[in-house]
From Swiss-Prot:
Recorded catalytic activity of this chain's protein: nicotinate + 5-phospho-alpha-D-ribose 1-diphosphate + ATP + H2O = nicotinate beta-D-ribonucleotide + ADP + phosphate + diphosphate
Name under which the protein is recorded: Nicotinate phosphoribosyltransferase
Pathway: Cofactor biosynthesis; NAD(+) biosynthesis; nicotinate D-ribonucleotide from nicotinate: step 1/1
The UniProt record lists the keyword Secreted: no
Modified residues (Phosphohistidine): H221
Family to which the UniProt record says this protein belongs: Belongs to the NAPRTase family.
One CC-aspect GO term: cytosol
GO function terms (MF aspect): nicotinate phosphoribosyltransferase activity
Record keywords, A-Z: Ligase, Phosphoprotein, Pyridine nucleotide biosynthesis
Species name: Yersinia enterocolitica serotype O:8 / biotype 1B (strain NCTC 13174 / 8081)
Post-translational modification: Transiently phosphorylated on a His residue during the reaction cycle. Phosphorylation strongly increases the affinity for substrates and increases the rate of nicotinate D-ribonucleotide production. Dephosphorylation regenerates the low-affinity form of the enzyme, leading to product release.
Any single GO BP term: NAD biosynthetic process via the salvage pathway
Protein purpose: Catalyzes the synthesis of beta-nicotinate D-ribonucleotide from nicotinate and 5-phospho-D-ribose 1-phosphate at the expense of ATP.
Pfam families assigned to the protein according to its UniProt record, in alphabetical order: NAPRTase, NAPRTase_N
Length: 401
């Protein structure tokens, strides 16, 4: 495999905002906790042939460091404290934390180390894998081609939305991890900023800084997964995670991800105190309409006006699906739509990679993500899945991947 000597990534901020938001919370609360995370390809792609090139890019990532301009930019945001930013300034990726191998054609990647350090690997590494694969398979693709496709999708959106009040539609770019390339994500988000008045932000800190957009993102599944071993009582782990997040961010970044266990298990823990303090909820698996109806009913049961809260939908969306959800809900609750792959790798003839990196251990003990979609369940240890299901009073067994 021919290697491109130049680095794909050129900024430490070329990552999802929630990684820095979680990293600060881990830095302040759980600095000595260790974790392990693993790569999964949910499709039938054999990516092992790219292992050497991926390893080369991982080595180059050790050169990334926060620049003075980036430090000043983060300092001007309301989220970060000086102790964390000074630590981040000295942070460097450590390639020894990542093992990459070609296992009979399958790509195996395992990341181990301190949570506060390894937390930053996932998003840029997935972006690197995606770009390497697409660059090798589809060298002919240009940013102009991607933007041309986006233009036609925006025209379609405008036609489909002509009969309703679309002024409350809000779009966020969530496209870093499975983008075709860094160049194409930049071109897509730039075009949206210029041509689509409903773009409210991007999850990518580098793009947010360069394009003067709001950075968006709160926490990921790993926040809740790690607390399965941090919390002394497993059944309390979700509440412990929700409270720890509020302790770190009392008045901001208040959107909670609901499907680490399941939506039903989440709502049992999401009492009036949490529901009042969190600004909203994020959907990432299962039927989105059913989920939204459950969220609205829960707020109403607690005596909270759903129009004072925000539902963020981010599971495999495109503009058409987002518009359908908007039609269903917009008069009853505030809405935001996070679209990723269908923005930054939506190119005729190109099949996006369905790849993830997920936590599998915390302090050498198993953790699990169950989710509201059976195919998204991740855990090494069937006995721990059973323990988790029992702790959260879950019925049906779902097969772990």
């Amino acid at each position: 495999m021919t290697q491109d000597a130049s680095p794909i990534l050129t900024s430490l901020l070329d990552t999802d905002a929630y990684k820095l938001h979680m990293q600060q919370a881990v830095f302040h609360r759980y600095r000595h906790i260790t974790v392990a995370a693993e790569f999964r390809c949910r499709g039938d792609e054999l990516l092992g042939e790219y292992a050497d090139e991926i390893r080369h890019q991982i080595t180059l990532m050790s050169q990334l460091a926060l620049t003075d301009d980036e430090y000043q930019y983060l300092s001007g945001l309301p989220f970060f404290k000086n102790d964390y930013l000074n630590w981040l300034r000295a942070f460097r990726f450590n390639p020894e934390q990542v093992t990459v191998s070609d296992n009979d054609g399958e790509l195996d990647i395992r990341i181990t180390g301190l949570w506060c350090e390894t937390i930053l690997w996932e998003v840029p590494l997935l972006a690197v894998i995606s770009e390497i694969v697409h660059r090798r398979r589809s060298a002919h693709v240009t940013a102009d081609l991607a933007v041309s496709q986006l233009r036609s999708k925006l025209q379609q959106f405008n036609a489909l939305s002509a009969d309703i009040d679309i002024t409350h539609f809000k779009l966020m770019d969530f496209g870093t991890r499975r983008r075709f390339s860094r160049e194409i994500q930049h071109a897509i988000v730039s075009h949206l900023k210029d041509e689509f008045p409903y773009l409210v932000g991007t999850s990518n800190y580098d793009l947010a800084r360069k394009l003067s957009l709001d950075p968006v993102g709160t926490q990921a599944h790993e926040w809740f997964q790690a607390h399965q071993q941090i919390s002394p009582v497993l059944a309390n782990s979700q509440r412990v995670a929700l409270q720890a997040w509020l302790d770190e961010y009392p008045n901001q970044l208040g959107v909670a991800l609901t499907d680490c266990i399941t939506m039903d298990a989440f709502l049992r823990d999401f009492d009036k105190t949490f529901a009042d303090r969190y600004q909203g909820l994020r959907h990432d698996s299962g039927d989105p309409v059913e989920w939204g109806e459950k969220a609205i009913a829960h707020y109403e049961k607690l005596g909270i006006d759903p129009m004072s809260k925000t539902l963020v939908f981010s599971d495999n969306l495109d503009l058409e699906k987002a518009l359908s959800l908007y039609r269903h809900f917009y008069q009853r609750v505030k809405l935001v739509f996070g679209i990723g792959t269908r923005l930054t790798c939506d190119i005729p003839g190109i099949k996006p990679l369905n790849i993830v990196i997920k936590l599998v251990e915390c302090n050498d003990k198993p953790v699990a993500k169950l989710s509201d979609s059976p195919g998204k369940t991740i855990c090494h240890d069937p006995a721990f899945v059973d323990e988790l299901r029992e702790a959260f009073a879950l019925p049906l067994v779902k097969k772990a991947s």
